Structures are given as C-alpha cells and as structure tokens.
C-alpha cells in the first residue's frame, strides 16, 4: 500500500445554513465544436466537444427573507440563438457548429410551478453565449449579477459595440450588480477568493478567472451535518479531464463503474493511461488551451483549475462543471433537488465517467479484464500533514472494497 499526496486544507467556515440546489438541464446542445479551442493536447476520441449546458436553481431560507433568496446560476443558450449578435451568429455558421435548443430556463421553471417574479437574481458565471441565455425572459425585477471586471471589460454590448458577442438588452431595464471579491463579504476558501453571498456561509461565489473576463464559480453548502458542498463550476473547466486525475485523485488501477460499458463491472485504468498524453496517473489528461481559442487568458485559466483540483480532492465537495454530460443518468435533475448527492454516492459513481469520451488503444482488454473483482483507489481518512486538526480524504490503493470515506470534521473539509 503506497500513500498518495495529501491535498492542502480547504478551510470553509462552519455553518448550519444551507441552500437547496437544483441542477437544470437547459435543453441546450452544441456539437461539432473543435475541442482544441478549449483543451490541449487532444486525446483519442475527444476531437470535438459535443455537450449540453447546466443551469442551477438556488433557494435560500432564513429568518430574514431577502430579494435574492431564489436565484438562477447561468441560463444556457437562448432558445432563439440566431438573435445573438450578428458577428457571433456569422462565426458559428462559418465554423459549422451545430446548436439546438428546445426551450429556455424561464419556461422550464414556469412549467414546474415556479413564479418567475420570485427569482430575485440571475448569476452569470460569465458572459459567453452558452451561459447567458436571455434574461429578458425574466421580469425586470430580476437582478443580473456578474463577476469583477465585467462593466469595464464587456460593456457596452451589442449593438452599441458592433463587434460584441453580448446583447446589451440582457441588463437594460434591470439592476446590474458586479461582485467585489475585496469587499466586506470577501474571504478565502482554499486558494479561491470567495464572497459570502448571504452572509451565513450557505452560498459562496468564487473568483475563477481565466476563461473569460469576470468568470465566477460558486460553492453551495448542500448539507450541514455532515457538511457537503456542490461546486458550480461554470466553465472553470470544459471537461473533467482538465482536473482529473491529480496527485490527490490518481487514476485507479481499476475503474468502477466502467466508463466504457454498462455490462462490465470495471475496466483497467491502464487502458486510459496508455492514451494519456504524459502517461502520468497523477496528472490531468488536458491543459486549457493557451493559444488561439476560447480562453481569455489560458495561463490564468490553468491557475483556476489548479485550485479546483485541490477542492476536488475532498469527497464532500462535488464539482459540477457546465458541460459534464457524463452526470446524466446518475444525478437527479430539476425539479428534483440535488442536496443529497453525497449520501447517494453521485461523485464516486461519476468521478471517472469522463473517460468514456476517450478511445483506448486496445478496447479488447476491457472484455478480457473488465470483471476483475479487486478494485483499487478507494478512499481512506488520514490526518493532514499540514494541520492535524484538519481531516483530509486521500486516495489509497486498497483491496478492501467496503472501505469508504468517513465524514469530515464539521469545521473543515
């Protein structure tokens, strides 16, 4: 048994306050998008990005109700996407992308009995077309919340700025709020700059720059005892292969559930190690593209991903990035709540699902070895080397399939 490096402590203030989180399938679907615009180097089987987009409904309850107790994080692609700015629509058609949108988030909420007047704010993780939707489908009383630098770096929008990719109608006639990560509500969570949105530790916005000006993620406390958190990633990563495997979450010798088949129990991790660009079981498959592509600053995007890697090392933090379609079939989608994700094992069941996007060099090995009963790479509780008071979850090689992660100390994760 060889130990794996312990992750740095990710300290989150203790709180008994939570928010209800709902993962919304926005019905947006994009295909034929070159993966090289987002990640490098390419891995066999993942040459194009074909993905949907998630939004989130956030509901907060407290003794002092506020306008923002009900919010939506991201909106996916607007249904009438050809009404996006002319320069963007022309570029999409020239590149040969395919975009399909069945409905919009406002309609999804309304069809499930949600009064849109109760939605106090829309939070944009960032201003790209597959996240901004159409805020005009919400009442003008719904505020629009954006990340730092938005007003200076993105405004004015189209059509005032003819080359803009953002419709300025999104914020016209409604309150536009830009988050300040240096203000009174600011703190650090791990290496993220954070903003305690409600002031009670239930919902934090995270500064995660690099992909776009003002990019933000969020950390929602989904249960208080034991503490669990869902990290709403936005586009902090476009594929889970950008933050897995890692020194804290290495590629296991046997992967279960099998990402290549629903009929075999597991498959050997070496199938994917064979196509790993660096043949390193402790390094992510991808880096964000640094050259021409969709990232505003690729180096800064990599720094945000490195912070995500540290958070992902903890089993009570569940990153949900906007385009991770491998979650479908495991997680509950709106109108069902997602707060019980940890007790239901969603992270464990989906951790390596992204490997199913790849084409191993020798898939016949799956049939020969896919039903091996010894599963390695389960979790074990160890004290942090940096601070013995901090309980860390680390990955250990083990033949004990019943060994599970114990619960975290309520003050730390």
Swiss-Prot record:
Binding site for Zn(2+) 1: 126, 128, 211, 235
Main enzyme class: hydrolase
EC number, as in UniProt: 3.1.1.-
GO molecular function: hydrolase activity; metal ion binding
GO biological process annotation, one example: secondary metabolite biosynthetic process
Highest taxon above the source species: Eukaryota
Keyword Hydrolase: yes
Disrupted-gene phenotype: Reduces the tolerance to benzoxazolinones but not to aminophenols.
Stated family: Belongs to the metallo-beta-lactamase superfamily.
Protein name: Gamma-lactamase FDB1
Organism listed in the record: Fusarium pseudograminearum (strain CS3096) (Wheat and barley crown-rot fungus)
Lineage of producing organism: Eukaryota, Fungi, Dikarya, Ascomycota, Pezizomycotina
């Amino acid at each position: 048994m060889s130990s794996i490096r312990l992750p740095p402590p990710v300290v989150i203030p203790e709180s008994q306050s939570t928010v209800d989180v709902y993962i919304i399938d926005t019905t947006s679907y994009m295909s034929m998008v070159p993966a090289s615009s987002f990640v490098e180097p390419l891995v066999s089987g993942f040459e194009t990005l074909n993905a949907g987009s998630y939004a989130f409904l956030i509901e907060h309850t407290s003794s002092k109700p506020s306008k923002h107790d009900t919010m939506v994080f991201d909106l996916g692609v607007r249904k009438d996407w050809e009404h996006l700015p002319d320069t963007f629509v022309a570029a999409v058609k020239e590149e040969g992308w395919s975009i399909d949108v069945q409905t919009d988030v406002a309609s999804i909420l309304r069809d499930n009995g949600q009064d849109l007047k109760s939605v106090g704010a829309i939070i944009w993780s960032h201003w790209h077309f597959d996240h901004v939707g159409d805020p005009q489908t919400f009442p003008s009383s719904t505020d629009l919340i954006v990340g730092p630098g938005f007003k200076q770096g993105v405004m004015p929008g189209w059509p005032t700025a003819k080359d803009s990719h953002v419709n300025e109608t999104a914020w016209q006639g409604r309150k536009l709020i830009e988050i300040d990560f240096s203000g009174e509500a600011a703190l650090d969570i791990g290496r993220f700059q954070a903003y305690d949105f409600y002031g009670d530790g239930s919902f934090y916005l995270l500064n995660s720059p690099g992909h776009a000006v003002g990019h933000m993620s969020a950390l929602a406390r989904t249960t208080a005892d034991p503490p669990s958190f869902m990290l709403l990633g936005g586009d902090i990563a476009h594929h889970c292969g950008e933050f897995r495997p890692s020194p804290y979450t290495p590629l296991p010798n046997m992967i279960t559930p099998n990402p290549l088949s629903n009929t075999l129990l597991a498959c050997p991790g070496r199938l994917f190690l064979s196509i790993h660009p660096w043949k390193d079981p402790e390094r992510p498959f991808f880096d964000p593209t640094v050259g021409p592509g969709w990232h505003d600053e690729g180096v800064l995007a990599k720094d945000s991903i490195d912070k995500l890697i540290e958070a992902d090392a903890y089993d009570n933090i569940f990153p949900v990035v906007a385009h991770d379609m491998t979650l479908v079939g495991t997680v509950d989608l709106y109108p069902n709540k997602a707060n019980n994700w940890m007790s239901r094992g969603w992270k464990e069941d989906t951790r390596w699902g992204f490997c199913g996007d790849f084409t191993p060099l020798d898939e016949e090995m799956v049939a020969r070895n896919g039903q091996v009963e010894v599963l390695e790479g389960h979790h074990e509780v160890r004290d942090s080397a940096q601070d013995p008071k901090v309980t860390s979850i680390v990955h250990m090689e083990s033949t004990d399939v019943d060994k599970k992660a114990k619960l975290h100390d309520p003050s730390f994760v």
